[in-house]
């Protein structure tokens, strides 16, 4: 069983040494893409990514400094700081959990295509849905083609916890029957009805991935046993290959990297 998540825009700086890094499966393509991105101006980054001048300048600097030297890299699982990674809490995974994750967890990335947890990467900013100025890089779905999907096993269940912007890079090439796509809902205290809350769902996806790894869940039938940060399986709201989990009171507020939008 493979677990899919995606990268976050927020990243942590690479620590100084100590980690044993693996090499991304599609690093040659990532180098090609990064080499192109080094040619873009601050203004082109601002236009393509809809960034403020300050953030565009920072993004330009990230690619100007980008390289593949191990001393400038950190494991992918430790490099991201968005809400999904707040739920994943990679820093608390045991060495045995991380070793298990290396064979199960895959991270979809605009720059690297697909990453294993211990793959060495540098800070960057490139979402899969960005439209870049020049072909063949203008459309990243076309740039990557089926290369990312070919990095996944040919058979077996894929637990899809990635955003649609990212999972499209694999779902269009693989049988839909292979995918299990959990949904995470929060009860509205005013109406008593379940609703989709973006930040809650992102943190829940990370917590779900963490639980699958820590509990060594191998049988897809056991997915319904997830009961972390307030969530419980809700059969009435579930569909085939789309199990629904509902929380009465969200238990992941303390995990979020955000200061708001948690209501």
UniProtKB/Swiss-Prot annotation:
It comes from the Bacteria. GO terms for cellular component: cytosol. InterPro entries: YaaA. Belongs to the UPF0246 family. One of its GO terms (biological process) is response to hydroperoxide. PANTHER family: PEROXIDE STRESS RESISTANCE PROTEIN YAAA, PEROXIDE STRESS RESPONSE PROTEIN YAAA. It holds the Pfam family H2O2_YaaD. This is UPF0246 protein Strop_2927.
């Amino acid at each position: 069983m493979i677990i899919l998540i995606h990268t976050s825009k927020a990243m942590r700086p690479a620590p100084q040494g100590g980690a044993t890094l693996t090499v991304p499966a599609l690093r040659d393509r990532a180098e090609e893409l990064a080499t192109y991105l080094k040619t873009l101006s601050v203004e082109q980054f601002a236009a393509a990514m809809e960034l403020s001048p300050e953030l565009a300048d920072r993004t330009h600097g990230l690619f100007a400094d980008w390289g593949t030297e191990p001393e400038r890299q950190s494991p992918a699982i430790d490099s991201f700081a968005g809400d999904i990674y707040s739920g994943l809490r990679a820093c608390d995974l045991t060495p045995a959990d991380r070793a298990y994750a290396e064979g199960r967890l895959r991270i979809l990335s605009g720059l690297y295509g697909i990453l294993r947890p211990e793959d060495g990467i540098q800070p960057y900013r490139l979402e899969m849905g960005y439209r870049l100025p020049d072909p063949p890089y203008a459309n990243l779905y076309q740039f990557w083609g089926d290369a990312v999907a070919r990095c996944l096993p040919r058979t077996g269940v894929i637990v899809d916890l990635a955003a649609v912007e990212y999972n499209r890079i694999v779902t269009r090439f693989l049988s839909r029957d292979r995918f299990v796509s959990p949904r995470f809902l929060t009860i509205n205290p005013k109406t008593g009805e379940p609703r989709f809350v973006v930040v809650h769902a992102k943190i829940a996806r990370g917590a779900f991935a963490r639980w699958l790894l820590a509990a060594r869940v191998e049988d897809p039938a056991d997915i319904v046993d997830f009961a972390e940060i307030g969530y419980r399986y809700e059969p009435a709201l579930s569909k085939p290959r789309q199990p629904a989990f509902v929380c009465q009171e969200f238990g992941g507020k303390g995990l979020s990297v955000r200061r708001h939008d948690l209501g």
